[in-house]
UniProtKB/Swiss-Prot annotation:
Superkingdom per UniProt: Eukaryota
Documented effect of changing residue 48 to I: In strain: CEN.PK 113-7D
Protein name: Putative uncharacterized protein YOL013W-B
Compartment(s) where it occurs, according to its Swiss-Prot or TrEMBL record: Membrane
Organism listed in the record: Saccharomyces cerevisiae (strain ATCC 204508 / S288c)
Membrane topology field: Single-pass membrane protein
């Protein structure tokens, strides 16, 4: 992952945390009776969207990075086996 992706991920996570803390405080104040909550369904859906966007973005980026690493390892291992004239060791298995 690049530094830009890490910065964007951290800022997205902080935004989600702040929005959720704000919602929890509103619910707490409403429960105590100090605050009357506005019914704003769009804010709720925005928070859910940001949360799932954050999760999906990082899961997909993690899977894509792992697939690239796995594919690279498999290709390197196969080329090692094909190019080696006699023996090659791949994952502790002796291939002749």
């Amino acid at each position: 992952m690049s530094d830009f992706e890490i910065i964007v991920g951290i800022s997205s996570l902080l935004q989600v945390i702040i929005l959720n803390i704000q919602n929890m405080l509103e619910v707490l104040l409403e429960y105590i009776g100090i605050h009357k909550r506005r019914v704003d369904i769009s804010t709720y859906y925005d928070n859910v969207y940001f949360f799932f966007h954050f999760i999906c973005y990082h899961l997909l980026s993690y899977c894509i990075i792992n697939l690239r690493i796995s594919a690279s390892f498999i290709c390197d291992s196969c080329s090692l086996i094909i190019m080696s004239p006699s023996y090659a060791v791949c994952d502790n298995i002796l291939v002749t």
